[in-house]
Regions:
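N-terminal capping segment at the start of a domain
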Residues: 9-23, 181-184
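A glycine-rich helix N-cap at a beta->alpha junction
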Residues: 79-89, 170-182, 205-209, 448-462, ...
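A short glycine/serine-rich beta->alpha loop
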Residues: 17-26, 54-62, 105-116, 347-350, ...
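A short, small-residue-rich loop immediately preceding and capping a beta-strand
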Residues: 21, 57-58, 108-111, 141-159, ...
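Non-catalytic terminal/interface segments that mediate subunit docking, oligomerization
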Residues: 309-453, 531-540, 546-548, 553-556, ...
């Protein structure tokens, strides 16, 4: 086996950075160096001088703890990561945090670290490539023509999301997805044969993947496997790479000791001797830089594509204009006016119905207007109402379909959606019941962390869903979503608020959105033009009284309840301001002046929402009150449960009177 200077440059930059930080994971970079050399040195099409080049190959490091391998590759190939940045590994505000964080300006395609999600992101990228290729490619010109590559490890395949996502990928024959499994047999606790004895080859065969086995330290074998993977166009490929974790370390290779800790000064010296590396820390010989420099080749590939696009402009001007718009992430020029017309129609024709049905009515507009809007559901399409009048099912026979049946895979769906957004050119939305956000939670969190505008649709939003009982009735879930930084949640009351919520979601550039809808019917609320214009602020006055005694606030299906309660309070000589709060998150982003214009801080506040009350204390004083739910639900008809938990006019009126009497 030959271990070249360029390959060992990867190893020792990783070793030295982890050693300097006295923190990190050197074992994986040392073990996967040959795999990286083969892929990045010969096959990966990318341009370090233009990381945003749209037809670049995507690379995902799913085993994100090995981040120094990626940072070393980016530095050596010519991205904006310097030796000083490598020396700052794991320091505050550095370009090189402990796990890779999405930053396409320096070549990092996605945030990884929570194991398994990277492979799901990569699958999402491959889905976007397949959809866009079907939409834009012509027989003579193919502007969308790239591969998605992913590195992953034993931990990724132990995580359940790997099953969800990889099964999905095989079903959809994602032939331009090529993955490399670092099969080193070691995790933090030691040798995995004590807890992970799956026959992973048979596992992936059963998914419908091509499986190839190689010596992970033999560059020639790896190179041939990549060629074979590219030649298989109807299956994703998993290349099983037998490796030695911490390769080159005389005393720690092949052990858990090298997984997540610096080698130590003495072992670093011995590793240098073992691999004949006579260079000081962070010193890379010129021959390694010469080998790795990808700026010239990348620029040439990028220029070839630019020229292809010019020809595409000439032959297919309409498609080319649409592709350019999609790459930029802009909405169509006439979209704003079209939405204003649609919103006016919603206001004029507002009728009582479940907000999940309101969402379907809105999707009939949005999906028709926005071809980049790709929907889906985790096997709840009829319940979530995600299939619009202009939807068609994505399949191998219909790769340009705009609705994906994800199966019962909430976590996989959410992480795949994130990958679709990261790819660009696609705006995905995916749905399940609100209670099952627990399954999807970490992918939703990562979308917020990455500042990408995934759209998560959650229906059946309270105990009012009824007989399915507490396993399906959300209570604490909106609190969790609302407490997540950079995540906007909406719980609209009717068709008009639903339309505004959807519009804000599709306009978003850096913030994911959760759209939360009811199973049961809701009322249609009358509004003035001024009230209509304030919905996108997150909260607004539905009814305002001079010299009001109290402010009633609600979201979603409870808005009509507080409207009715306010009318009843008038019979008791109590005047109430009524506030609809479809998005507490957005309301809290407004100025204090605006918030005070909606909620009088000098008057008592009563909030009514069919969920756990903890979200609301950010806008309340000690003596204010929330009518909410602090226990699990029960199995019964929804109307009975609402009465049982006090969501009725009488209880709201009595609570308001009690609050005023305290």
């Amino acid at each position: 086996m030959q271990h070249t200077v360029p390959t060992n440059a990867l190893r020792f930059l990783s070793i030295d950075a982890v050693q300097k930080a006295n923190s990190g994971h050197p074992g994986m970079p040392m073990g996967m160096a040959e795999i990286a050399t083969s892929l990045w040195g010969k096959h990966l099409n990318h341009n370090p001088l233009n990381p945003h080049w749209f037809d670049r190959d995507r690379f995902v490091l799913s085993n994100g703890h090995g981040s120094m391998l990626l940072y070393s590759l980016l530095h050596l190939t010519g991205y904006d990561i310097s030796i000083e940045d490598l020396k700052d590994f794991r320091k505050l505000h550095s370009k090189t945090p402990g796990h890779p964080e999405y930053d396409i300006d320096i070549g990092i395609e996605t945030t990884t670290g929570p194991l398994g999600q990277g492979i799901a992101n990569a699958i999402g990228m491959a889905v976007s490539e397949k959809i866009m290729a079907a939409e834009f490619n012509e027989d003579d010109i193919k502007p969308i023509n790239h591969y998605t590559y992913a590195f992953l490890g034993d931990g990724c395949l132990m995580e359940g999301i790997s099953h969800e996502a990889c099964s999905f990928a095989g079903t959809h024959k994602l032939g331009k997805l090529i993955c490399f499994y670092d099969q080193n047999g070691i995790s933090i606790d030691g040798e995995i044969e004590n807890w992970f004895t799956d026959d992973s080859i048979k596992r992936f065969d059963s998914y419908g993947w091509q499986t190839i086995c190689v010596d992970g330290h033999n560059i020639e074998e790896i190179d041939k496997a990549i060629v074979d993977a590219k030649n298989e166009t109807n299956k994703p490929t998993m290349i099983f790479c037998k490796t030695i974790i911490g390769f080159g370390s005389p005393n720690k290779s092949g052990t858990a000791d090298v997984h997540g800790a610096a080698l130590g000064e003495e072992e670093v010296i011995k590793t240098r001797e073992a691999l004949n590396w006579d260079h000081d820390a962070f010193k890379v010989p010129q021959e390694a830089y010469d080998f790795w420099d990808s700026t010239k080749k990348g620029s040439e590939l990028n220029l070839d594509w630019d020229n292809l696009i010019k020809t595409y402009d000439e032959k297919y001007p309409d498609k080319s204009a649409e592709l350019r718009r999609r790459i930029k992430g802009d909405l169509p020029d006439d979209f704003e006016n079209s939405f204003k017309t649609f919103l006016s129609e919603c206001d004029k024709n507002n009728t009582p119905m479940a907000t999940r049905k309101c969402s379907k009515a809105c999707l009939d507009f949005f999906v028709k207007e926005l071809p980049e809007l790709i929907g889906g559901s985790a096997d709840l399409t009829p319940s979530n109402n995600t299939f619009s009048s202009s939807s068609s099912t994505f399949s191998n026979e219909n790769p340009s379909g705009n609705h994906i049946n994800y199966g019962v895979r909430e976590f996989g769906m959410s992480a795949i959606m994130n990958g679709m957004v990261l790819h660009g050119g696609i705006k995905p939305y995916g749905a399940t019941f609100l209670v099952f956000t627990d399954y999807a939670r970490n992918a939703v969190r990562l979308s917020a962390l990455m500042e990408i505008p995934s759209i998560f649709v959650y229906t059946h939003d309270s105990v009012a869903l009824g007989e399915d009982g507490p396993t399906h009735q959300p209570v604490e879930h909106m609190v969790t979503l609302r407490s997540t930084p950079n995540l906007n949640s909406w719980r609209p009351a009717d068709l008009v608020e639903t339309a505004v919520a959807w519009n804000e979601a599709v306009k978003s550039k850096k913030t994911p959105t959760c759209l939360i809808f009811s199973r049961q019917g809701t009322s249609a609320i009358s509004r003035t033009e001024d009230q209509l214009s304030l919905i996108n602020k997150g909260g607004y006055l539905i009814d305002e009284s001079d010299n009001s005694d109290i402010t009633l606030i609600a979201s979603g299906s409870e808005v009509q309840l507080i409207i009715d309660a306010a009318k009843e309070l008038k019979n008791h000589s109590i005047s109430a301001n009524v506030v609809s709060m479809p998005s507490l998150d957005l309301f809290l982003q407004q100025s204090e002046e605006f918030q005070s214009s909606i909620i009088n801080p000098d008057k008592p506040i009563l909030v009514v929402e069919c969920s756990h009350p903890n979200s609301w204390y950010r806008i309340l004083n000690r003596k204010d009150k929330v009518i909410g739910i602090e226990s699990f639900g029960e199995s019964a008809p929804g109307s009975e449960l609402l009465e049982h938990f006090g969501f009725n006019t009488e209880n709201v009126v009595n609570s308001a009177k009690s609050l005023l009497n305290d």
